[in-house]
Amino acid sequence: MECILDFSISKYEKKVQTAAFEVPSSCLAICFLYELPEQIALLVNMIVEDPSGRVRFQKQLGYSEKVIGLGQSYMDTTIGGISNTIEAGTWTIKVILASEYVKKFFADEKINFTITVTDEMRPIEEHLGEDIWADADFRYAMYDTERVFNPNKRWYKGDFHTHTRLSDGKETPERVMEKAHFMNLDFYAATEHNVMHTGWPKTDILVLPGVEITTSIGHANLFGLKKRPDFLDEILENDNEELLEDIWNRIAVWCKEQEALLSINHPFLYLWKWKYSGFPLEYLSCLEIVNDPTYAAVKEAKAKEANMLAIRMADCLWADGYRICAIGGSDSHNRMDEFYDGATENSIAGDPATWLYMEGLYACGIYQELKKCSACVTRYVEDLDIAIYANGKKVLPGAIIPDSTTSLEWEIYIKSKDYFPKLFVLVNGQRQELLLESDDGQNYVGSGVLEIPKKDYCWIRFGAESIHNEFMMYANPITRGKTAHKLYTFEDVKAVLEI
């Protein structure tokens, strides 16, 4: 079997181009061959559907090898594919262009390219991996959310926003796991642009399947998914902002129905900021408050200012009585040895890190702790312990304490080799400086008693900065009492922040 399918890229071409090919009953695997420069391949998403209309492969072509395999074993199947029986009949390839960027970077030129479809297999370097997650219907039937990776009760360190070659990252899953080990991560969320991992290489790091819903009006990660959502096709195929707002509303409702988590990413960052002002806050589970801090070297992006605004937004939401978990994401795309222009630090998974205190490390437990908001976001912190006591009972960040609580006892430990952490606490937005001490210049400890004002609603947040006011820690607030919401949409928050 062999056929050659023709496609074109220009600002005048259709965003979605479809071609069909026939697969005989004797076929055991399919190989797809193409040739495109990397920067052009980044503009192309490819989806393959079988004769039953099921998605069997989805990927942003990007930085990957130019050979794609789809077979019955993980060794024959490229990342983003589903290894299963190759059904005889009419298969379909969809090529979906990132038309927003095509219009931006293309003048009147046109690039023609072909995809050769054959049953003669080639070696696959970017194969699926031994841990298969998805079945033939793209449900995460083989992903065990209860599998315990570590039984111990402690703080676990991870990253909630990452990329590989499945979308526009430059590293394979195997390589990003090496970097995750280097950063001492316990968990890692795989969040690609509008495409989803179907499996992963064997690893002792807990990998969470997620997706970064990526549109021209904003980006958000989804966690705790049980299957590939149908709306991914709509997201990939549409650019109309009014229609996208409707899709975002449906995504929000779908997440609540599916008990999935929705987290807005880099809400104020440059070209990729959140633009859907009418988005209802009641559907927001998490908020990314620190996104790839190394990107601050790109001056026009104003990434540091964007992250500080996101931190202010999180505080604003807590002050208004919302329980939206602040988390961090490296958004790492680059190689280990690669730096943004002007940067002295490389973008890497785990910078920033998000910590969760858990009685054993497993996926379902992570989702539960995010819903409780018991997370702490850090930079330059190698180890961490936060012990807070309300009426003699130990509580975590994000806890709701009894109305009878008049004070909190706190003990905080931070390990940082390169930066001295200045600890502080915000009580209803009022800042108090706290003392940390160290005997060796890297292990810092402090303790004290914090009085809580007599108010109907109080929120108490511990944080840390370096002596040069660089972000080091954000512990989600502890709250007492309740307050009625005054903010209902993203636009309401922007008005309070005066942006």
Language model: regions and residue ranges:
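A metal-dependent hydrolase metal-coordination microenvironment
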Residues: M142-Y143, V148-L284, E288-A314, D320, ...
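Solvent-exposed, flexible loop/coil segments flanking beta-strands in beta-rich domains
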Residues: M1-E35, T116-P123, G129-D135, E146-N152
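C-terminal functional module detector
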Residues: E120-I124, M142-R147, S332-I499
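Short beta-strand-plus-loop segments that form exposed binding edges in beta-rich domains
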Residues: L36, K94-K103, G463-H468
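Surface-exposed beta-strand/loop patches in noncatalytic accessory domains
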Residues: E2-K11, E35-T77
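Non-catalytic propeptide/linker segments at domain boundaries
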Residues: I86-Y156
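Extracellular and analogous surface-interaction loops
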Residues: T18-L28, G80-A88, I400-S404, I452
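Beta-sandwich interaction modules
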Residues: S64-A88, A98-E100, G446-I452
